[in-house]
Amino acid sequence: MSLQAPSRLLELAGQSLLRNQFLTIFTLDELPREVFPLMFMEAFSMRRFEALKLMVQAWPFLRLPLGSLMKTPHLETLQAVLRGLDTLVAQKVRPRRWKLQVLDLRDVDENFWTIWSGARVLSCSPEAMSKRQTVEDCPRMGERQPLKVFIDLCLKESTLDECLSYLFGWIHYRRGLVHLCCSKVQNYSMPTSSFRNLLERIYPDSIQELEVWKKCSLNKTGKFAPYLSQMSNLRELFLAFGYERELYVSVQWPCIPDLDSPFLCLYYPQMLYIKKISNIKEHLEHLLRYLKNPLGAFIFSDAYLTDRDMECLSQYPSLSQLKELRLIHILMWTTNLEPLGVLLEKVAATLKTLVLKDCRIQDPQLRVLLPALSHCSQLTTFNFHGNETSMNALKDLLRHTRGLSKLGLELYPAPLESLDYKGHVNWEILTPIRAELMRTLREVRQPKRIFFGPVPCPNCGSWPSEKVDFHLCS
């Protein structure tokens, strides 16, 4: 007899019980645990819903990974499994063989079914399988701890599909007996009120990643604060609020909202990304004030910064330890940049990426920034592309990078002297100017990757990712 023969005999025994409809809860209590996965797969493929219900009641493993078996949601299958759970949670005394603690509806554990189907029977014994069946995603449970149902929730429509609707309705009427655990929740389309109702049915400690895209005014973002305050294990948060989906907040650690603030008060944020918010001048100061711990990255794009906004950037502790600062497509040609220089001084010891791109910074403003920029010794990337500066101002800028030995990528605009009256580059003029700029730079340090002028180069299509000391098209 081959080594796979016992597996085949178990499969045949299970098929016989199912096809002859001899299966009862008493029969299942007497069967070896190795039979269950094979029988469950058979009942699943044959749509034997009563058998599925009974097998859930007698399931001899800690976890039932239904999601990896049911690739496409099937309402009747889900109903049968949940009816089996109903019988379990309603019993005051648990059945003798009851071990089931988690129904997992995520597609995360195909190995369980392939092992027991015989595809990998030679490499995994029942004892080893028993060790694999742990409940890693939830706390250790005592005798009367709630059952847990795991699912990843991605809402791309305004309403739930029939399976999710049934599941959430089932959960609603079994509070305290069953916890719905969602480690990852994404909402792209569901209305705010409906989504908040769903959050009330999810076990809050289970949420580790939350992503919300909503069109609403910024002063309504605080409606999510009461829910976030309960998510003690939240590791990643991505929020996009506003009429153009422009305010992004990314967190890597727990966040504790200040319920008195219209903004979400994030205690351990990593990144704040603000884009195209027309009324940000009414909110930026408020937002920065309520960020309690230092940000790792601040990205501000396609908006207008007033002088007061600039002052805010230099005043609040939340921006005092930035590793990444990106100001992109922000018209600064009339803005006082002295506060930005103060901010650069504060973050000089931590800043690694500085992007001041397409901001129309002119010579007088650039010179205000140079002393602070020269102290940013950790800088590895500097993008100053898309600004309006002369050759002499760029030379001055390059000289001030003498101490920035870690710079690996630099992007600079074509000097004003090389542009025609339409703002287009005259390559015959730019070529010798760039050579002179490179001589100026090499007098103070040796560059690694550097670009002057349009990116990508309109002549050869080169990008600054190429490892060239100096890009020059003829």
Swiss-Prot record:
Repeat (LRR) residue spans along the chain: 97-124, 179-203, 204-230, 231-265, 266-291, 292-323, 324-342, 348-375, 376-400
The record's Gene3D superfamilies line, in alphabetical order, gives:
Ribonuclease Inhibitor
The alphabetical list of record keywords is: Leucine-rich repeat, Repeat
**Assigned GO CC terms:** Cul2-RING ubiquitin ligase complex; cytoplasm
An example GO BP is: positive regulation of cell population proliferation
Which SUPFAM superfamilies does its entry note? RNI-like
Question: What highest taxon heads this organism's lineage?
Answer: Eukaryota
MF-aspect GO terms: ubiquitin-like ligase-substrate adaptor activity
Q: InterPro entries, alphabetically?
A: LRR_dom_sf (IPR032675), PRAME (IPR026271), PRAME_domain (IPR050694)
Describe the family membership recorded for this protein in Swiss-Prot or TrEMBL.
Answer: Belongs to the PRAME family.
Q: Which PANTHER family match?
A: PRAME FAMILY MEMBER 10-RELATED, SIMILAR TO PREFERENTIALLY EXPRESSED ANTIGEN IN MELANOMA-LIKE 3
State what protein this is by name: PRAME family member 10
Recorded source organism is Homo sapiens (Human)
Q: Which gene encodes it?
A: PRAMEF10
